[in-house]
Amino acid sequence: VLCGAIPVYVNPEVDQRLGISLGMQREQVAKAIKEHPKAVAVLVNNPTYYGICSDLRAIVKMAHEAGMMCLVDEAHGTHFYFGGGLPVSAMEAGADMASVSMHKSGGSLTQSSLLLTGPDVHAGYVRQIINLTQTTSGSYLLMSSLDISRRNLAQRGRQIFHQVADMAEYAREEINAIGGYYAFGKELVNGNSVFDFDITKLSVHTLDIGLAGIEVYDILRDEYDIQIEFGDIGNILAYLSIGDRAQEVERLVSALAEIRRRFQTDGSGLLSQEYIDPQVVTSPQEAFYADKCSLPLRETEGKVCSEFVMCYPPGIPILAPGERITAEILDYIEYAKAKGCNMTGPEDPDILRLNVLTGRE
């Protein structure tokens, strides 16, 4: 929206059972690069919230051979720099820049992150650009937490994340033994759209017990005082990191077993698909600043959206400015709202109305 870039989406493969998007397929990235030779960069989200990793080395190589930069959203990959047996980190793969959310798995305070730059990126120029979009009066509290966390990981990171990985693997085995749940892991790896998997991520598919992920999330919080990372349409994610202990994992496993016994249903009426291919009509910047009007949600079908709509977490847009609103998207929004998902982005916080472009179909 701010810079006027026009995105070219490389739609990921979708796991039909889990209903989640996977990584970027090499051939699809190569196709997009070939069809858009004037593009300046390839942006990769690696790993995904669920722990899915793309073939980052290959994607970086393709981007560089085409004269493009490779930028990596590595928000959930802080620990890749410190753990043996974990997927390759963005910098190790040769990426030009990577944003790393230290507060997610590194132990720093919420909102604190690092922007890593490669040898071909001018750090001074990057700093100038950052100063255009954020405060020049940085929080020393946040910066101190970053430095303390960095020191802790530099000294003990490998040991810490080895323990985290062991806890996650143990939890997967125990949860899968309950029946009805599927805590997925490295068995998803196929060498392409799932090139690797972050074994510290404890993602659990819940639809086979007849409950949406967000419903299990709510039950864990309200009935068992267990706060996990998030629940979506068909899965939950328990984010294990440096502050977790084995007894907390045991509590989670026991609670999931009891939830299955107490709340299992036949699952009728549940949606399973999490990702909907976007239909881009115009650039995000043009759509965001264009003339617009507000319409009741169901009257927006076929119109071009001028705002973001997303479930948060994980914060992946269901709609972005410039994308066409379809019946499938509207069904998804209404279903997610009914199940209790936290929806953000639109001007109307209740999402009873959406802003759409005037005069554009």
Feature names for model-found ranges:
Residues 149-172, 248:
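Structural signature of PLP-dependent enzymes
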Residues 1-7:
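Substrate-binding/gating loop at the entrance of the active-site cleft, primarily
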Residues 170, 176-345:
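Conserved C-terminal alpha-helix-loop-beta "cap" of PLP-dependent enzymes
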Residues 7, 70-71, 228:
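Hydrophobic beta-strand scaffold residues
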